[in-house]
Amino acid sequence: MLEQPYLDLAKKVLDEGHFKPDRTHTGTYSIFGHQMRFDLSKGFPLLTTKKVPFGLIKSELLWFLHGDTNIRFLLQHRNHIWDEWAFEKWVKSDEYHGPDMTDFGHRSQKDPEFAAVYHEEMAKFDDRVLHDDAFAAKYGDLGLVYGSQWRAWHTSKGDTIDQLGDVIEQIKTHPYSRRLIVSAWNPEDVPTMALPPCHTLYQFYVNDGKLSLQLYQRSADIFLGVPFNIASYALLTHLVAHECGLEVGEFIHTFGDAHLYVNHLDQIKEQLSRTPRPAPTLQLNPDKHDIFDFDMKDIKLLNYDPYPAIKAPVAV
């Protein structure tokens, strides 16, 4: 089955992973250096052993492709993946006068009473981002995140580089170039970033009329994050191939630190007990070619029949 490389990775970390303390104080079992390969001609690699919300993956990738860095677009599509990063900026500001939100990530997981207050404040924050332009501009914008790095990389000269746009043009004109690379890792920015890029670099490769993509991911949350990452970069491969008139080849996923959080072990064991089902297929709007013009309705997933979702706490 198409998702078997993911299941093999999870089992390997369960069997061979080294225990490590981590930034979130949760603890992980990890391995260093691993690679998965997915043949995209055999289906779309959205996991079937648990339900993965493809709508969130679509809206997040479109957010990146548009070069957007403000969570308003995500909120308009009921996507809350990036809420906490913007909310943190708000509650640390001099303008915030609500309940104490210090260390809200950990406290909301351990204290049900605080969690209720936190969710109420987050709902108020999201509503203001959606309906107050000035507030959204100040507190909804995340700055140097993937959309900015891919589409408007800031140079030391004060201008910007559209890395992804430039690479797509190179694929069309020089498909066999070995420089078809988009990087999100800027050492100058890392010390001041809320979360340095986990997906640090990806490279395209053209052969026999097929487009492949390899991602290097420095840090990977195997249970919660990696299923999203696989589908997101597989979708990106499809979209770029679509614009460039190519078929899809492989998505190759290379990891640095690939880890399972201690509080995800029961969940991944439950997932590994399930037998994978046939992979779904992807359908793109044939009447659109510029991927930067795509919207939600232009991307459809067909024949997705997953097992139920498995809930797990997010390490923050």
Curated annotation (Swiss-Prot):
Q: Which InterPro entries match?
A: Thymidate_synth/dCMP_Mease, Thymidate_synth/dCMP_Mease_dom, Thymidate_synth/dCMP_Mease_sf, Thymidylate_synthase, Thymidylate_synthase_AS
The pathway where this protein functions is:
Pyrimidine metabolism; dTTP biosynthesis
Q: Which reaction does it catalyse?
A: dUMP + (6R)-5,10-methylene-5,6,7,8-tetrahydrofolate = 7,8-dihydrofolate + dTMP
| Listed transmembrane segments | none
Q: Which SUPFAM superfamilies match?
A: Thymidylate synthase/dCMP hydroxymethylase
Which EC numbers does the record give? 2.1.1.45
List the Gene Ontology MF annotations in alphabetical order.
Answer: thymidylate synthase activity
> What positions constitute the catalytic site?
198 (nucleophile)
Q: Name one GO biological process term.
A: dTMP biosynthetic process
Pfam families the record matches: Thymidylat_synt (PF00303)
Q: Name one GO cellular component term.
A: cytosol
Subunit annotation: Homodimer.
The family classification in the record reads: Belongs to the thymidylate synthase family. Bacterial-type ThyA subfamily.
Q: What does this protein do?
A: Catalyzes the reductive methylation of 2'-deoxyuridine-5'-monophosphate (dUMP) to 2'-deoxythymidine-5'-monophosphate (dTMP) while utilizing 5,10-methylenetetrahydrofolate (mTHF) as the methyl donor and reductant in the reaction, yielding dihydrofolate (DHF) as a by-product. This enzymatic reaction provides an intracellular de novo source of dTMP, an essential precursor for DNA biosynthesis.
Q: What is this protein called?
A: Thymidylate synthase
Organism for this UniProt entry: Lacticaseibacillus casei (Lactobacillus casei)
Q: Which gene encodes it?
A: thyA
